[in-house]
């Protein structure tokens, strides 16, 4: 019995020594610190992109939430972040070439690059542009940049974005998109079914074009406009709204689609026209907009997509993430 008790006491003592030793090591032993850098992903799950553009054979840009700008020089195979210098939402982007591009966003923000995005500089719209949410920017066939947005904002730049001039009076309308017809007219589409056009070569005493309102059979917000040729154009909007003209915009017919999903953007490569929108919606027409295939960007894609750029058979679709696909798919 005494022998067994001795061994029990020895085990307890040994356990106590081990605990004390571990405690002493924890308090006194200093191991060299090693810092492991954590590199954030270029494209993260919480990213939201609002606009994209394809330039030339390999260059692509996308812009979005919190001032994020990404550029690819490998046809979308890899992306590099660029420093916008801002944290505001960037709503639209257009490019003259692989070096010169313009971005618009919230609070009248305009960013300009002439060096492939290595640097982005802020451009002032003037006092009347302060606080105005700019929603879209596009470049017409003459190289003039047009930016549109809330409170009737319509601005134009004739010097690759260095300076801007207001081209319409302030009004309580948000213009969501701007498009160009082959005869040189500029078309605007906006909330509550508003549509207007003007010839920018004919201006009043204030230097503004004389905008003419167009009545269409839609009262939902219109989000996109595109001309396919001199006679044919399309307008798309919320709740599956899709309008088509075959007489250069004199009259517009409603095209009934088997969907009530929102259509946020339209793009065409000359023979294929594609629209994207809410809950993964993707509509495709090979017939100049007379008939449409209605589906999804991908089978399990229920994300929203706000913009699409097309060049040849390649498509860049942006929204809750990036989707790149071949137009033949």
Where are these regions (language model features)?
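Residue-level hotspots at or immediately adjacent to binding/recognition sites across diverse folds
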Residues: 1-329
């Amino acid at each position: 019995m005494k022998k067994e008790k001795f061994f029990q006491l020895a085990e307890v003592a040994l356990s106590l020594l081990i605990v004390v030793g571990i405690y002493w090591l924890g308090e006194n032993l200093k191991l060299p610190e090693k810092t492991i850098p954590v590199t954030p992903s270029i494209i993260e799950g919480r990213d939201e992109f609002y606009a994209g553009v394809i330039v030339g054979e390999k260059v692509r840009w996308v812009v979005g939430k919190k001032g994020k700008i990404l550029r690819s020089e490998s046809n979308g195979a890899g992306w590099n972040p660029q420093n916008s210098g801002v944290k505001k939402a960037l709503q639209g982007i257009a490019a003259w070439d692989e070096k010169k591009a313009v971005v618009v966003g919230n609070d009248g923000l305009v960013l300009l690059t002439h060096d492939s995005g290595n640097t982005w500089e802020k451009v002032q719209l003037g006092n009347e542009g302060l606080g105005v949410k700019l929603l879209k920017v596009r470049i017409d066939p003459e190289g003039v940049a047009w930016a549109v947005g809330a409170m009737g904002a319509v601005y134009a730049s004739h010097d690759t974005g260095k300076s801007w001039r207001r081209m319409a009076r302030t009004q309580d309308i948000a213009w969501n998109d701007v498009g160009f017809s082959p005869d040189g007219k500029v078309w605007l589409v906006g909330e509550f079914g508003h549509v207007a056009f003007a010839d920018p070569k004919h201006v009043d005493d204030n230097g503004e074009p004389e905008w003419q309102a167009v009545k269409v059979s839609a009262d939902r917000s219109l989000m996109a406009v595109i001309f396919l040729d001199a006679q044919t154009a399309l307008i798309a909007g919320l709740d599956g709204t899709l309008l088509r003209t075959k007489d250069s915009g004199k009259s517009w017919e409603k095209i009934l689609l088997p969907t009530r999903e929102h259509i946020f953007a339209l793009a065409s490569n000359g023979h294929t026209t594609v629209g994207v929108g809410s809950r993964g919606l993707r509509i495709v027409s090979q017939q100049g907009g007379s008939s449409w295939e209605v589906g999804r960007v991908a089978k399990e894609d229920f994300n929203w997509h706000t913009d699409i750029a097309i060049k040849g058979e390649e498509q860049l679709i942006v929204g809750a993430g990036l989707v790149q696909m071949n137009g033949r798919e």
